[in-house]
């Protein structure tokens, strides 16, 4: 266990809450102490929902541990069933309750309830939120469909041709607290409808128990979010013979590949290769003269597996960026992320330590960071522009407007979101030319982040660099001014090299001449 002020994922029972809150007619009884009852804020504040999550807490206290906590579980299960009348009941325990080994799921299953009871065993000390969401959705699908499992798991995705109807697919994986899931579903539905493909079931987002039972009626499954749906799609493929698509349609190239994959599986004529150029503005923008300032921009990418992989492809193939860092906190997605990083000549960063991510970001010296809410904070400290591409996210990353990431419109949104933090070419030149004029205020809000400043500096001042003993270094005002003329994305590296050079030669005061000497030294 690690003590930290930030975590990329919550414990697995938060993933279970996401599934329960995403569905209709499902209630979750969570065996948990008072301190674990914080879920309401996640959904009402961050997700901007008007409804509280369908969760009942047993809220045991320290004095209850000397008595019969099993009876406490049963009482809360009865009360939840009587009050909410759910179509299906999820029963599990929080990370703290796991320690007392009450097995609430088994207790609930032995109560003779009329609705399906799904017992969740989510190891809180070895797994995390996305795994918990995937396991919960998998257990829901498995428990509700096990009686429909055919003896022969042969499934023909071209059955629609013989039945004289349009092909039908399911969209699996979208959930609450996912990144733009609501908007992605609408965009993918629109995309498929334009190609003559109907959408049968969307799950877990907005689905009920009866909807899950209709999953086998479709011709194939679309795995929109592998972190949540891949295990369920694999089970449906093994037991029902239902194939599923593996391409996540984020970006122009991936959207085209997704359509080709789905059309091939359904036995349909694939779409035209130039459809992306006709329906999305991203290809035209990225090839226009105005976007030449994007070419070669250094980008650091970190997020969940699906969005990090999609961002790496868009940056390298569609926008002409240079990817200088790629990583994920999703250990379940480590293998494909490592493969993508290797193809880009990089070593993937697989970590859930935000400090390690910040250190890697500083070392890579990018011009743009694509990451989570935490990377936005880290990038601001480093003075680097940032766009959020993945959960965990802030409420400001859940816009009221339609803002998908998938499909043709998603590609347009991505172009805007990623380019807006960057300074345009002319703006960059003007700021470089006039930065030292007295009218220019460093503290002005800009796309580079809120680094602040104090306008004109006192040229007689010295800047102290904390160090041990007699090794303290001092930057003079003219040295700092010269350093500011260096592009921000390599400024940190130049500062470190100059300080290392100054220590090597025994120089305690760093001025512009020291900076030039260090530059010559490292170029030699």
Swiss-Prot record:
Residues given in the record as substrate binding sites: 425-426
Active site residues according to the UniProt entry: 290 (proton donor)
Molecular function in Gene Ontology: 4 iron, 4 sulfur cluster binding; ATP binding; metal ion binding; oxidoreductase activity, acting on iron-sulfur proteins as donors; oxidoreductase activity, acting on the CH-CH group of donors, iron-sulfur protein as acceptor
Pfam family, one: Oxidored_nitro
Record bears the keyword S-adenosyl-L-methionine: no
Keywords, alphabetical: 4Fe-4S, ATP-binding, Chlorophyll biosynthesis, Iron, Iron-sulfur, Metal-binding, Nucleotide-binding, Oxidoreductase, Photosynthesis
Coiled-coil region list: none
Catalytic activity as recorded in UniProt: chlorophyllide a + oxidized 2[4Fe-4S]-[ferredoxin] + 2 ADP + 2 phosphate = protochlorophyllide a + reduced 2[4Fe-4S]-[ferredoxin] + 2 ATP + 2 H2O
Enzyme Commission number(s): 1.3.7.7
GO biological process: light-independent chlorophyll biosynthetic process; photosynthesis, dark reaction
Cysteine pairs bridged by disulfides in the record: none
Top EC class for this record: oxidoreductase
Family, as annotated: Belongs to the ChlB/BchB/BchZ family.
Subunit annotation: Protochlorophyllide reductase is composed of three subunits; ChlL, ChlN and ChlB. Forms a heterotetramer of two ChlB and two ChlN subunits.
Listed name of the protein: Light-independent protochlorophyllide reductase subunit B
């Amino acid at each position: 266990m690690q003590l930290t002020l930030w975590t990329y994922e919550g414990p697995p029972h938060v993933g279970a809450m996401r599934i329960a809150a995403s569905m209709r007619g499902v209630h979750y009884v969570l065996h948990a102490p008072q301190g674990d009852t914080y879920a309401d804020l996640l959904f009402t504040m961050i997700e901007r929902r008007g409804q509280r999550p369908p969760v009942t807490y047993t809220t045991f206290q320290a004095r209850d541990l000397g008595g019969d906590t099993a009876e406490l579980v049963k009482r809360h299960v009865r009360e939840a069933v009587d009050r909410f009348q759910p179509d299906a009941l999820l029963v599990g325990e929080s990370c703290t309750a796991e320690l007392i080994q009450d097995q609430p799921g088994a207790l609930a299953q032995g109560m003779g309830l009329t609705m399906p009871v799904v017992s969740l065993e989510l190891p809180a000390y070895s797994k995390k939120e996305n795994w918990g969401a995937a396991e919960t959705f998998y257990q829901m699908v498995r428990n509700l469909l096990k009686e429909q499992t055919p003896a022969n798991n042969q499934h023909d995705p071209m059955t629609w041709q013989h039945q004289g109807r349009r092909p039908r697919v399911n969209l699996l994986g979208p959930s609450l607290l996912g990144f733009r899931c609501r908007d992605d579903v609408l965009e993918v539905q629109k995309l498929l409808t334009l190609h003559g493909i109907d959408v049968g079931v969307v799950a877990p987002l907005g689905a009920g128990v009866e909807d899950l039972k209709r999953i086998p009626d479709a011709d194939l499954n679309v795995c929109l979010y592998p972190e949540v749906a891949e295990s369920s799609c694999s089970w449906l493929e093994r037991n029902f013979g239902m194939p599923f698509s593996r391409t996540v349609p984020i970006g122009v190239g991936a959207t085209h590949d997704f359509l080709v994959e789905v059309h091939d599986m359904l036995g349909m004529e694939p779409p035209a290769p130039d459809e992306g150029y006709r329906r999305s503005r991203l290809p035209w923008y990225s090839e226009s003269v105005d976007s030449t300032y994007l070419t070669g921009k250094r980008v650091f990418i970190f997020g969940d597996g699906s969005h990090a992989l999609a961002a790496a492809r868009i940056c390298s193939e569609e926008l002409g960026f240079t990817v200088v860092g790629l990583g994920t906190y999703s250990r379940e997605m480590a293998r494909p992320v490592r493969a993508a990083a290797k193809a880009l000549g990089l070593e993937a960063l697989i970590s859930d330590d935000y400090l390690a991510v910040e250190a890697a970001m500083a070392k890579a010296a990018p011009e743009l960071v694509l990451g989570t809410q935490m990377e936005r904070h880290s990038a601001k400290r480093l003075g680097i522009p940032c766009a959020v591409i993945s959960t965990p996210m802030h409420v400001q990353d859940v816009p009221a407007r339609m803002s998908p990431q998938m499909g043709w419109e998603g590609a347009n949104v991505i172009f805007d979101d990623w380019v807006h933090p960057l300074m345009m070419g002319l703006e960059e030149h003007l700021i470089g030319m006039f930065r030292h004029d007295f009218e220019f205020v460093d503290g002005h809000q800009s796309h580079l982040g809120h680094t602040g400043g104090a306008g004109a500096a006192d040229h007689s001042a010295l800047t102290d660099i904390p160090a041990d003993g007699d090794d303290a270094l001092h930057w003079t005002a003219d040295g700092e001014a010269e350093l500011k003329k260096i592009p921000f994305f390599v400024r940190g590296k130049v500062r470190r090299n100059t300080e290392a050079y100054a220590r090597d030669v025994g120089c305690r005061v760093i001025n512009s001449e020291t900076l030039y000497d260090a530059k010559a030294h490292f170029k030699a």
